[in-house]
Amino acid sequence: YRRQRQMCIRDRIRYCVEKVAHRIPVVAGTGSNCTETAVYLSQEAEKIGADGLLVVTPYYNKATQNGLYQHFKMVADSVKLPILLYNVPSRTGTTLQPETIVRLCRDVENIVGVKDATGNISQTAHLMSIADGCVDLYSGEDAIIVPMLSLGAKGVISVLSNVAPQETHQICSLYFEGKVKESCELQLKAVPLVEALFCEVNPITVKKAMQ
C-alpha cells in the first residue's frame, strides 16, 4: 500500500509539472510522517522537475524538536531543491517551534523558510524576532494574511486562492504597494468565504466551490 501511495503522489506531481510547463514554479508537497517516504518523494519530485518542495511536519508520531530537526535535515540533504517547512499543528498534532525553524534555516542551506499555518500571531512574531533574516515566511492562514505580511511574510500559500485567486493576489499586492487600508478591507471582505471553505473537512468544500 505504501508503495502504491508513493507512486500515486509521484504521478500527481508529474501531472502538475507537465501541465504547468515552466509557466510558473511548481512547489511539490512531499512530506510524510515516515522520513524514508519523505526522502523518496522529494527525490522523485526533483527528478520530475519540480522547482521546490513543501514538507509538512511529521504527523501522528509526535517527534521531539530534535527529532523534527533530524527528519527535515535528512530530507533536505537528499535533494538540492529549496524547501519550505510546513508548520500546521492543527492537522499534525505537532508544533515546529520557532527556535527549531531558525536552526534548520541557518544550518541547512536549502531549507529557506516556512509556511506558517499555526494561526498563532504571537508565536510567529517571536519567530521573526529571532530569525535575523534567515527565514522566508509565508502565511498559511487565509484569515490573517495581512497580519502575517505585517510581520514580514513574503506572501501566502493559500486555500482561498483556489476559488478567489484574483482577490487573494490583490490582498498581497495592495499591501506591498503600501495600500495597507485597501489590503485590510479586502482581507476582511474575504473572511466569510474563508470561514465557509472550512465549514467541513478540507478539501471537500474547496472542490465543491471550484465546480
Regions found by a protein language model. Name each.
Residues R10-A28, Y69-L85, I130-D132:
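Alpha-helix-loop-beta-strand connector modules within alpha/beta enzyme cores
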Residues D77-S78, R91-F198:
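Catalytic alpha/beta core domains of metabolic enzymes, predominantly
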Residues V206-Q211:
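Scaffold signal of the M16-like zinc-metallopeptidase fold and its non-catalytic homologs
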Residues R10-Y15, T35-Y40, Y60-M74, G93-Q97, ...:
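Active-site-adjacent beta->alpha loops and helix N-cap segments on the catalytic face
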Residues Y1-I9:
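Single conserved hydrophobic/aromatic residue that forms the stacking wall/gate
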Residues V39-L53, H71-L81, P98-V112:
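Alpha/beta enzyme core
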Residues I24-V27, D51-L54, P82-L84, V112, ...:
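Structural motif
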Residues P25, G29-N33, P58-Y59, Y86-R91, ...:
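Active-site beta-loop-alpha junctions enriched in small/polar residues
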